[in-house]
Amino acid sequence: MTKQVLIINVTRMGDLIQTGPLLSRLRDEWPDVAIDLVVDRSFAPTAALLTGLRQIISCDFTGLLDECRMQSKSLVTLMQGMTAWAAPLRAARYDRIINLTFNRQTGLLASYIGAPDLRGIIAGPDGCPIVQDPWLSYFTDLHRHRRFNRFNLVDLYAMGGSGTGAFSPLSITIPADGRAWADLFLQSQGRTVRQWIAVQAGASDVMKAWRPEYFGQTMARLSRHSGVGFVMIGTAAEADAI
């Protein structure tokens, strides 16, 4: 019988890209595995670039958190809405759930959906978050010992979500229309640029982002080299920083 895995990874665009080797590792573990991915609605286009997914399940988690903060709806109403949204996932009867979004809310979601094998943050018996799996427990303490860490985030995801296996590089699949648009855009900017550098000035949390002036200073230094051009990338929410 085909194994089913649900990955919850809702908050960061970069983390989605770094999920690629985990997808490959899961296919090594179970060649016929069906993998579903839960993401924030704003990151669904990024998730579509990953290979090996059965389906991408999106939700406006950002809007949901805003409603919680502003108390525009009662907690009971919000919980009823989320349980209704998650009902099909609960009915899917996943074999494994891997929660790579390390906060209490997604821990509650993972535990509500349920699976025989839960990894990452889940809700404990008293509702408080606990971390399942030694590799993902290590990840949650990483900020305390960064100087001593020798593991890449990609490897922690792959080891925690699956286990040991063959090396798999980061990779995404660029659709033909996206590649054609990029070629046309870059060609329209002139032929003096020999090396393009993509700059993402935003972050999932403004407190984690560089100040815009630091990006400006870095780009100014890099621009001293001839033939260098810059492309600012990001989401609509990061437009002010750009």
Stretches with model-predicted labels:
Residues 1-242:
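Catalytic machinery of carbohydrate-active enzymes
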